[in-house]
UniProtKB/Swiss-Prot annotation:
It is found in: Cytoplasm. One of its GO terms (molecular function) is protein-macromolecule adaptor activity. The keyword Ubl conjugation applies. Its main location: cytoplasm. GO terms for cellular component: cytoplasm; cytosol. The gene is ART10. The keyword Ubl conjugation applies. This is Arrestin-related trafficking adapter 10. InterPro entries: Arrestin-like_C (IPR014752). Interacts with RSP5. May regulate endocytosis by recruiting RSP5 ubiquitin ligase activity to specific plasma membrane proteins in response to extracellular stimuli. It comes from Saccharomyces cerevisiae (strain ATCC 204508 / S288c). There is a cross-link at K118 (Glycyl lysine isopeptide (Lys-Gly) (interchain with G-Cter in ubiquitin)). Keywords: Cytoplasm, Endocytosis, Isopeptide bond, Ubl conjugation. Present with 736 molecules/cell in log phase SD medium.
Length: 518
């Protein structure tokens, strides 16, 4: 009967996933029903990332009337690899002085413990990167990425094209025990027989090592465009998107016959395509192009995120837009409050209007419904070809008039004008809504397509998020919708660490002294 070997990993410090400060440790169990010749038993801790990208035949370029054949592009990066021998012990192994003579192990059960050092901060593959290596990160900002798509085999069992293409990028960490038998070598069996057992685990670095740093060169940032050949937007299985951004340096574009290209798969409703010709970057012409990047500005130390478009008002001359103002909306941790006062997320939302104040004060403007979506953009890169995947999670959808608060959410009696009187603003008090003020982000630690919610960027995989705030309005009986996009937003699956100030010691009056009579 063949030997049975298994791995038992000690649980992580937080009880959920391994992190940067953990030391991987555990026990290797070996059961033998008969004597066996064993040369050595090793435990290997390793991680790797793998991506596969495709080129759509529809967008292939022709050379002299000949269509270039399509091909798959694969990349494989070794993130880390450490090996530890658990049998035989070091003193015995050193005494062998290179001898390959095996050990005869009697039947029975054997346990071998192992422990590795803390996880490295940077991936091992950096030493193999050259000046021509195509990657999303540089040597200075590269960090060991979190586990991603470790259940990729399950995606192939689902008849869903989006999940199939989503599984083309993965980051997997594992502990592998390798038992090398001591069978004598011969000309027809030149290698020792190996028995392997693998145990995968989830690794997520500390938040400081997940932060996506902005690109060093703003010229490398390319706006994403909507390909309307299949419609402006598409909703499938409650997953949709409105905006995305693909950032790839121009030098990283695959060049074929003097023309370079980066292409997303056609199976997604939005395609990102860029051409490089004569050293210049230009967008691929499409039937209708809409920019999705919103400009932000600072007001009183807060970033202002305006709505993507202005809404015309019934008088034909006035218009209004929505502004979200925040100091810290670019990072959101799990269990952060989204609308509560002081959360610095959506607690300061304003309606900004332009027009005649007398006309504006007569209008009936009421917020009716609110929907907040989390938009995911995952980009895989391989051999200079990048494919984008897009999906959406609905965080909340609520009828704002279902529960009445003490004060109206929008009171036009509190409208005020700016310093030059050209615009007027009024606060939309979403923070006072009895449901919204209790809403926290990702309280249940949701797994989207098998992965926790976190942003990260590594050599060939980039996962970013943005927030989309949709509000439906009733304006003099006419329904209109506003949209605000916050892009990008750094998402963490960890709970924010609240540093509480140490309480001052209680005041104790000093003792009183009396002079003793001499």
């Amino acid at each position: 009967m063949a030997p049975k070997i298994s791995i038992s990993l000690n649980p992580p410090y937080n009880g959920e996933f391994y992190s940067s400060n953990d030391q991987m440790s555990g026990i290797v169990s070996l059961q033998l029903t008969k004597a066996l010749s064993i040369r050595k038993i090793s435990v290997i801790l390793k991680g790797f990332s793998e991506t596969l990208t495709k080129i759509d035949q529809e967008y292939m370029f022709q050379q002299n009337g000949m269509m270039m054949p399509g091909q798959d592009n694969k990349s494989f990066h070794t993130l880390m690899k450490f090996e530890q021998r658990v049998f035989p012990p070091d003193n015995v192994w050193n005494a062998l002085d290179g001898s390959s003579k095996p050990f005869k192990v009697k039947p029975g059960s054997y346990n071998y413990s192992f422990q590795f050092d803390k996880f490295p901060r940077k991936p091992e593959c950096l030493k193999n990167h050259t000046a021509k290596t195509v990657a999303f990160v540089t040597r200075s900002n590269a960090r060991l990425p979190p586990t991603f798509n470790s259940h990729w085999q399950e995606f192939n069992k689902i008849d869903n094209l989006d999940l199939y293409f989503y599984s083309f990028g993965k980051v997997i960490y594992m502990v592998q025990v390798q038992l090398e038998l001591g069978k004598s070598s011969s000309w027809f069996k030149p290698f020792h027989k190996l028995i392997r057992e693998i145990e995968t685990f989830e690794f997520i670095p500390e938040p400081k090592d997940l932060i996506i740093e902005p690109d060093e060169d703003d010229n490398e940032e390319l706006n994403a465009f909507s390909n309307n050949s299949r419609g402006n937007s598409m909703v499938t299985n409650n997953e949709f998107f409105n905006s995305s951004n693909l950032k790839v340096p121009s030098k990283d574009v695959k060049v074929v016959n003097g023309v370079g290209y980066i292409k997303s798969d056609r199976n997604f409703s939005q395609a990102n395509s860029i051409l490089i010709e004569n050293g210049d970057i230009r967008s691929r012409p499409v039937s209708s192009v809409t920019s999705t990047r919103q400009s932000t500005r600072l007001v009183n130390g807060m970033k202002v995120f305006p709505s993507t478009y202005k809404m015309g008002l019934p008088d034909g001359e006035s218009n209004m837009r929505i502004e979200v103002r925040s100091r810290d909306l670019k990072q959101i941790y799990r269990k952060d409050y989204l609308f509560r006062s002081g959360s610095q997320n959506f607690d300061k939302v304003y309606v900004v209007m332009e027009g005649n104040i007398a006309s504006l004060s007569k209008m009936q403007i009421t917020p009716l419904k609110l929907q907040l979506n989390l938009l995911e953009t995952t980009t895989y890169l391989s051999q200079g070809i990048a494919n984008g995947n897009y999906s959406s999670l609905k965080l909340i959808e609520i009828d704002l008039n279902q529960l009445k608060s003490n004060k109206p959410l929008l009171d036009l009696n509190e409208i005020r004008e700016n310093f030059d009187g050209s615009m007027f603003e009024c606060e939309l008090r979403l923070k006072d809504h009895p449901i919204l003020r209790k809403l926290v982000f990702n309280e249940e630690d949701y797994r989207h397509r098998g992965n926790r919610l976190y942003s990260f960027k590594t050599c060939t995989i980039k996962r970013t998020f943005s927030l989309q705030l949709l509000i439906e309005w009733g304006i003099n009986g006419i329904r209109k919708q506003s949209e605000v996009n916050i892009d990008p937003v750094q998402i963490f699956c960890q709970v924010r660490e609240h540093v509480e100030a140490e309480a001052l010691p209680r005041y104790v009056p000093p003792p009183t002294y009396t002079e003793m009579a001499s």
